[in-house]
């Protein structure tokens, strides 16, 4: 290893490298920061599962539905091995997402993701955002008629 190829070592650096990869739409690089037994919880979607394939699906669905997705990180707060990232996700819908059919609406939504890092890998990801706000931004008129995609 050369001095110019420094790997992230602190929990905050590991999470920042995940977020940087996600912002570049490099899902493979983002998922590479996760432990093989990573626990993934996406509270607004009612998702709670284990494994990097789940994380890959969550990220891929976002990038697919919003191909111009921009992730603007406002804060990364580290407390030991737990890191919270606050960011805004922005983009124009180009495919169905979370049951909302594509109406080419612009989405901008604040999110908070909590990560736990152990032995240099992300072992837990919990994502939070206001699902009602997401549906309003995507022009869903009736929540009882969400299309399951």
Describe the predicted segments one by one.
Residues 1-149:
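C-terminal and inter-domain tail/linker signature
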């Amino acid at each position: 290893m050369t001095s110019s190829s420094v790997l992230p070592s602190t929990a905050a650096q590991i999470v920042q490298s995940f977020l940087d990869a996600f912002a570049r739409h490099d899902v493979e690089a983002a998922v590479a920061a996760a432990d093989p037994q990573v626990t993934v919880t996406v509270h607004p979607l009612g998702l709670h599962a284990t494994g990097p394939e789940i994380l890959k699906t969550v990220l891929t669905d976002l990038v697919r539905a919003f191909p111009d997705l921009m992730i603007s990180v406002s804060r990364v707060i580290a407390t030991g091995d737990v890191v919270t990232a606050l960011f805004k996700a922005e983009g124009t819908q180009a495919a169905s997402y979370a049951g909302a059919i594509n109406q080419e609406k612009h989405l901008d939504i604040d999110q908070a993701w909590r990560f736990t890092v152990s032995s240099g890998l992300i072992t837990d990801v919990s994502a939070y955002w206001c699902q009602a706000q997401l549906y309003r931004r995507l022009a869903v008129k009736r929540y009882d008629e969400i299309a399951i995609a």
